[in-house]
Amino acid sequence: MIKSELIARLANENPHLTQKDVERVVGVILERMIGALEDGGRVELRGFGALSVRSRPARAGRNPRTGETVDVRAKHVPFFKSGKELRGRLNADE
């Protein structure tokens, strides 16, 4: 599911809200989550999972085409850890 599909589905399930209203709400939620991650925080959605930022150190990489060694700079990447309820629902039939 992509963001536009989520917005359309939420608007259909909540006829008292327009699609524009749902779009604004989803946009604000995502912006707040991104803002929290930018500030070095963590976003936890109980039962679903937690988003945080992890640091990747600088390292030596290799260009697969030429074999040349290149320096890869240190960077921050988003990290998702699934919640217990989500894992349980995904593995319910096993």
From Swiss-Prot:
Cystine pairings recorded for this chain: none
UniProtKB keywords: DNA recombination, DNA-binding, Transcription, Transcription regulation, Translation regulation
Cellular component terms per the entry's GO annotation: chromosome; cytosol
Transmembrane segments: none
MF (Gene Ontology): DNA binding; structural constituent of chromatin
Gene3D superfamilies registered for this protein in UniProt: IHF-like DNA-binding proteins
Cross-referenced Pfam families: Bac_DNA_binding (PF00216)
InterPro entries: Hist_DNA-bd (IPR000119), Histone-like_DNA-bd_CS (IPR020816), IHF-like_DNA-bd_dom_sf (IPR010992), IHF_beta (IPR005685)
Entry similarity comment: Belongs to the bacterial histone-like protein family.
HAMAP family tied to this protein: IHF_beta
Protein name (database record): Integration host factor subunit beta
Species: Caulobacter sp. (strain K31)
Source species taxonomy: Bacteria, Pseudomonadati, Pseudomonadota, Alphaproteobacteria, Caulobacterales
